[in-house]
């Protein structure tokens, strides 16, 4: 993480912690925009939760720095306690008062802060809590309890929403139930979120920025699609790149949505979508093939000029190529997984200009961002 400087920058989340807590040795530094979702990803036990607790001020490392949107929470001379950081920290298993109804729980949390971000009625509407207001936690499902915990956290009028693996115990159907509410929070409130998870599928759906951890160390940090091309993720069997595109139109004759990304254009089979809507496209490495010349006649609709920036072995028979699409002033990353035989037969090398043929990217569960 060379080049990191400990300064509070407006519009950024600045974090640097070094030291040991509860047998976890942290060596973490990253800087990400203080907007959207920053996911912290890594295997269980790598220090994600310890890092989250340091950011929230629940645990303290003497050698630490934390600043949010230009406001210093911890440095050599400052340590702001948790109640002064205005962090909404939602745990894996929500802690709720068993004797209070949903209504009374929300009103209790609303009474402690002026509604600068959202008020009681706004939370009830945003999280669909109206039918649950007279119930107690024992009469709520796990996802309903999670929604109540989110609502209570938001009524604290936080500067930062910190979610520590909130979907870790959920099956896929339960995750699909709660994820849209997280997306509604993101779309409705100007509130940065740090999302702790070891499930890359959830991260691909939610995150704008990604911080990767291993053995207590931050190994990479940056925009999601850039960090997805890091060897640690690009080498995974399910490697993919997520691209945030804009709907540019619809081909009604063939049922194809037209998507724009800088100067690139994608055609994707889908129902009509509102022009101008933002849409996340997931392109798996295995869905991209490589050609050295532009195809003259092909069933592949999406073909782009690209340059090979890295090649990573994948088992004995395959190679993962890290590509940069030529889409204007700055390139867009893409991954392609091909056989070693094809790599050698095409005489590919780092820096080679090629044509990336994308079979058909997939939209997220709901597609919209």
Curated annotation (Swiss-Prot):
Q: How does it sit in the membrane?
A: Peripheral membrane protein
Q: Superkingdom, according to UniProt?
A: Bacteria
GO molecular function terms noted in the UniProt entry = ABC-type molybdate transporter activity; ATP binding; ATP hydrolysis activity
Locate the ABC transporter domain: which residues?
Answer: 10-240
User: EC no.?
Assistant: 7.3.2.5
What Pfam families does the record tag this protein with?
Answer: ABC_tran, TOBE
Cellular component per GO, a single term: plasma membrane
Query: Which UniProt keywords are listed?
Result: ATP-binding, Cell inner membrane, Cell membrane, Membrane, Molybdenum, Nucleotide-binding, Translocase, Transport
**Where found in the cell?**
Cell inner membrane
- Return the InterPro entries for the record: AAA+_ATPase, ABC_transporter-like_ATP-bd, Mo/tungstate-bd_C_term_dom, ModC_ABC_ATP-bd, Molybdenum_import_ModC, Mop_domain, P-loop_NTPase, Transp-assoc_OB_typ1
Its biological function? Answer: Part of the ABC transporter complex ModABC involved in molybdenum import. Responsible for energy coupling to the transport system.
Query: Belongs to which family?
Result: Belongs to the ABC transporter superfamily. Molybdate importer (TC 3.A.1.8) family.
* SUBUNIT field: The complex is composed of two ATP-binding proteins (ModC), two transmembrane proteins (ModB) and a solute-binding protein (ModA).
Protein name as it appears in the record: Molybdenum import ATP-binding protein ModC 1
